[in-house]
Design a protein with these regions (language model features):
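Trimeric viral appendage architectures of receptor-binding fibers, tailspike depolymerases
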Residues: 1-18, 31, 216, 345, ...
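Amphipathic, non-transmembrane alpha-helical segments in extracytoplasmic/periplasmic proteins
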Residues: 31, 40, 85, 102-138, ...
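Intrinsically disordered, low-complexity terminal/linker regions enriched in Pro/Ser/Gly
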Residues: 11, 104-130, 262-272, 278-288, ...
Length: 443
């Protein structure tokens, strides 16, 4: 079985306390933009299990590194110990974005990948308040990016992990943390953060080797396909102001007919109206993709992991049963080790429709603002613009989104809502004794 190296944190650096190669099972989920989890089960009576007692971190290879967050010891006929935790980059969730002294926001105007690196640097390593510094961390800045493609990040009190996840998901950026020998003293180890971009290995490109999944190619053992037609792809973002004077912007206004799925985003906290397009783009990214595949790869293809494909790469799925062909990004890879068995499970596309993500969307209280700049930054936009200047829209579009014809409006006073909302409304009496008035929109 593959060795798992176990580390303890000390003031001088991370210290190797033991190596485990006799575990019962080990599963580790790596994610491109998010943060995965892992679980390790072993017999507590073994010599190795006793050596690693009190460990803080684990490492199997580049990227498969985790922080220990939970320990369970089931003492019965067998003394079973189970360690659980998250990917090593999950340590970022222990910090919030603190602005510099005498500043309302932490402002960074760079390429999205460099923004992530600067957030890591200012909030984990070179903090204004030295009590916030997490020791034994290094940030790798070797990524090559287009410096003309910029966003403006203005962070204030948002969770560091959430902020990075938002940017990484919106801009298809990968990030991870690994354990490496300390540069100043290789007797100790340190945590190193990396930011990277996956490689395009899809069918219709010729620069890189292709990564094509297909049952007839015998590289898929099992698959679970999910398509959801209700994922929003067009966002009406409403900023400051009231009524017809409220600043608004439509992201991806080119979608038409039944292919257009609209969502309203309340962005009244955004002071600068040029930030509205990016707020819409990042919120749309949270809803995930229409297509999502969960696939168990064949054993032969699993052996090519790290050489023929890697987390974050773009490939192509040719599903003969459904008659579809789609390009996808490898957003999640789970390695499962049990005795002498090894399997690889992958997720293609972002699946953000689970309950936890929905709650996060509705309860997020971050005061972070992002502004996109540069011709290559994308993000859609209304009125045919490049995305950085909000275009005026007909206020009736807001009314039709929030209160379509047939909607009911409750009021504690007898005032026709048309005076503030527009449209035509009539009093609606459902019967019974009510302490409020009800209006129904007719046109």
């Amino acid at each position: 079985m593959k060795e798992i190296r176990c580390y303890k944190n000390t003031p001088n650096g991370l210290v190797l306390v033991g190596v485990i190669d006799d575990y019962q099972s080990f599963s580790f989920t790596r994610t491109y933009s998010d943060c995965g989890e892992w679980q390790l089960t072993l017999n507590g009576d073994t010599k190795n299990a006793k050596l690693v007692k009190g460990m803080n971190y684990i490492s199997m290879n580049n990227g498969v590194c985790g922080v220990v967050e939970q320990l369970e010891n089931n003492v019965g006929s067998n003394n079973i110990i189970t360690y659980k935790g998250s990917e090593l980059k999950g340590i970022t969730s222990s910090r919030i974005v603190m602005p510099p002294n005498n500043s309302a926001y932490l402002t960074i105007k760079k390429n999205p990948a460099l923004v992530i690196l600067d957030i890591l640097n200012t909030q984990l390593v070179n903090c204004t308040d030295r009590r916030r510094i997490i020791p034994n961390i290094r940030i790798d800045n070797s990524i090559e990016v287009d410096t003309t493609d910029k966003i403006e990040f203005n962070g204030r009190f948002g969770n560091v992990y959430d902020e990075i996840n938002t940017i990484a998901t919106a801009y298809n950026i990968g990030w991870y943390a690994t354990i490496e020998p300390k540069q100043s003293n290789n007797q100790y180890a340190e945590i190193v953060f990396y930011v990277y971009h996956g490689i395009d290995r899809s069918k219709n490109q010729s620069t890189n080797s292709r990564f094509i999944l297909r049952y007839s190619n015998d590289n898929i053992e099992q698959s679970d396909y999910q398509y959801i037609d209700t994922i929003p792809n067009t966002a009406l973002v409403a900023g400051k102001g009231e009524g017809i004077n409220r600043k608004t912007y439509i992201v991806n206004d080119t979608a038409i007919g039944l292919n257009r799925k609209e969502v309203y985003i309340d962005a009244r906290d955004v002071e600068d109206e040029t930030l509205l397009p990016q707020r819409g783009k990042e919120k749309l990214a949270e809803y995930g993709d229409n297509n999502s595949y969960q696939i168990t790869l064949s054993r032969n293809l699993s052996k090519q992991y790290h050489s023929a494909f890697e987390l974050g790469d773009i490939g192509t799925i040719q599903d003969d049963l459904l008659g579809i062909e789609i390009d996808f990004r490898l957003t999640e890879i789970t390695e499962v080790y049990e005795s002498d068995d090894f399997r690889l499970e992958v997720v293609c596309g972002y699946d953000k429709k689970d309950l936890g993500s929905a709650i996060k969307r509705s309860t997020s209280n971050t005061e972070t603002l992002l502004k996109i700049e540069g011709s290559g930054s994308g993000g859609g936009g209304g009125g045919g613009g490049g995305g950085s200047t909000p275009q005026p829209i007909d206020p009736s579009q807001i009314l039709n989104l929030v209160y379509p014809i047939g909607s009911l409006y409750l009021s504690i006073n007898n005032v026709n809502p048309s005076s503030s909302l527009g449209g035509t409304w009539v009093r609606f009496d459902p019967g019974g004794k009510l302490t409020y008035y009800m209006w129904k929109r007719t046109q």
